[in-house]
């Protein structure tokens, strides 16, 4: 399951119909990749962050990995979720006149705490 499923993205954008599902899916993928790039995450790191499994009660199951503790993983996921939703909302609202430089600067600020290579 993805970190942010389509139904959650649509809820965040306040979109009720399925008319724009394809567009929202494309923008969601772009927002995810942009956030991964800005955070300087490797493919392995993103795979761990993006792999979420739930039990029958809807609780997140622990992920076997050597990169993060469960607490760190939860923190990184939360930061990534906020950044991805922000980027998605920005791209959705500014389809025609998006200022990608301003978006990237905002994402750097949002992702600073998990950004790789920042001392």
Residue locations for each model-derived region?
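Divalent metal-cofactor coordination and adjacent catalytic microenvironments
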Residues: 1-119
């Amino acid at each position: 399951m993805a970190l942010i499923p389509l139904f959650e993205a649509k809820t965040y954008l306040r979109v009720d119909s399925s008319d724009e599902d394809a567009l929202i899916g494309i923008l969601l993928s772009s927002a995810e990749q942009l956030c991964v790039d800005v955070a300087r995450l490797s493919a392995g790191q993103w795979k761990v962050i993006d792999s979420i499994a739930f039990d029958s009660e809807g609780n997140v199951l622990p992920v076997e990995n050597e990169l993060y503790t469960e607490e760190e993983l939860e923190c990184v996921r939360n930061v990534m979720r906020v950044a991805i939703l922000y980027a998605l909302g920005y791209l959705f609202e500014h389809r025609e006149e998006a200022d990608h430089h301003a978006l990237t600067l905002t994402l750097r600020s949002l992702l600073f705490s998990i950004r790789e290579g920042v001392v």
